[in-house]
Amino acid sequence: MARFMAYNQNPQMLALCITVAVMFLGVRSELSQDIKGCQDAMSDLYSCLPFVTNKAKAPDSTCCSTLKVKIDKGQTRKCLCTLVKDRDDPGLGFKVDANRAMSLPSACHVPANISQCPDLLHLLPDSPASQIFKQFTESSSQTVGHKAVSTSSSIKGRDNKQFGLMMAGALSIWYIM
């Protein structure tokens, strides 16, 4: 009761709490939206997780046979792209190796064009997430083996959104006070 009265007597504190809550809900809902349509496809590709999380040297036969059957059906191709795009999101519950996830189709001898991922995910051509797919496509067309895709120095799209939300919250607080 005392806490409620404190918020009631201090509208700036109430505004701050609401702003922070909205910011965190907005950031969390992006992963939920991305993964929402992928539940079936991801459960189909569960056997591929050891490979894309760098726990197995090669995808197993179950992974590859499932990928061959499912890649052109439903959301599987888009979900594989989403897995790469959201690879660093703690909400996934596991760490995805972007190079391994993008090389999964070729490791299973399944035709899939990773360069189509930015279009499938409706990414802006110059966005950091789009650049991951572009770098991988360029490196795999220039060499027989796959080079590592550098992501540590780039600012990810999700980080940009979170930074924008934090700035909006800070400006709101500054304006109220």
Curated annotation (Swiss-Prot):
UniProt key word Cell membrane: yes
Gene Ontology cellular component terms for the protein in this record: plasma membrane; side of membrane
UniProt membrane topology term: Lipid-anchor; GPI-anchor
Subcellular localization: Cell membrane
SMART domains noted in UniProt: AAI (SM00499)
UniProt KW Cell membrane keyword: yes
Entry-linked CDD domains: AAI_LTSS
Tissue and organ expression note: Expressed in seedlings, preferentially in hypocotyls and roots. Also observed in siliques.
Disulfide pairings: 38-81, 48-63, 64-108, 79-117
Chief subcellular location: membrane
Lipid-modified residues, GPI-anchor amidated serine kind: 152
Propeptide: 153-177
Entry keywords, A to Z: Cell membrane, Disulfide bond, Glycoprotein, GPI-anchor, Lipoprotein, Membrane, Signal
Signal peptide as annotated in the record: 1-29
Glycosylation, residue list: 113
Protein function: Probable lipid transfer protein.
PANTHER family in UniProt: BIFUNCTIONAL INHIBITOR/LIPID-TRANSFER PROTEIN/SEED STORAGE 2S ALBUMIN SUPERFAMILY PROTEIN-RELATED
Annotated family: Belongs to the plant LTP family.
Protein name per its UniProtKB record: Non-specific lipid transfer protein GPI-anchored 22
Natural source organism: Arabidopsis thaliana
Phylogenetic classification of the source organism: Eukaryota, Viridiplantae, Streptophyta, Embryophyta, Tracheophyta
